[in-house]
């Protein structure tokens, strides 16, 4: 059974708001804008939060991405998450595959993210050397805080995606309590 993205509809949407799964080549919102949305599809993932960002070369649906929300030249920038990262994380819910694309990353709720291996319910998520993907192999400094596997038993490794529960996940490349 393949894992699929939810059918997200904004809660309390404003007129002119860019849809959650919509990619635009025009910046429609300030970077860092956070909205809530509800999955109204058969996947029934409940509610989640999403943050507005720029795309990144090689971005893909389900990719884990680090993002920057501070003002300045890097505002809204994303990077495909990779081992030894140090940034807040989100899941791409649309094909943000260029720095001229604008859209949303999921930062809380039940979602689907790229995974190199199938990890079980409540499994810890770790960054990998494969950009944008995670697995459950314990590596010092690569743990993703506030993220856990939520696959259940019905999913297969072949779809290279895993269901996860996230709550504003982040990584910090911390290898000891002194660094």
Report each predicted region and the residues it spans.
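Glycine-anchored, exposed beta-strand/edge motif detector
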Residues: 2-179
């Amino acid at each position: 059974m393949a894992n699929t993205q939810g059918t997200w509809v904004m809660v309390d949407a404003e007129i002119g708001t860019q849809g959650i799964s919509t990619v635009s080549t025009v910046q429609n919102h300030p970077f860092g804008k956070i909205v809530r949305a509800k999955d109204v599809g058969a996947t029934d993932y409940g509610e989640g939060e999403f943050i507005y960002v720029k795309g990144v070369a090689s971005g893909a649906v389900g990719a884990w991405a680090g993002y920057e929300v501070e003002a300045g030249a890097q505002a809204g920038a994303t990077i495909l998450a990779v081992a030894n990262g140090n940034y807040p994380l989100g899941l791409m819910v649309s094909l943000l595959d260029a720095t001229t694309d604008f859209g949303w990353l999921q930062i809380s709720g039940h979602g689907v993210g790229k995974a190199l291996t199938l990890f079980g319910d409540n499994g810890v998520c770790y960054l990998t050397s494969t950009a944008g993907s995670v697995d459950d192999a314990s590596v010092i400094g690569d743990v993703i805080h506030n993220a856990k596997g939520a696959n259940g038993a019905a999913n297969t490794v072949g779809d290279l995606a895993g269901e996860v529960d996230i709550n504003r996940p982040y990584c910090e490349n911390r290898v000891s309590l002194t660094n």
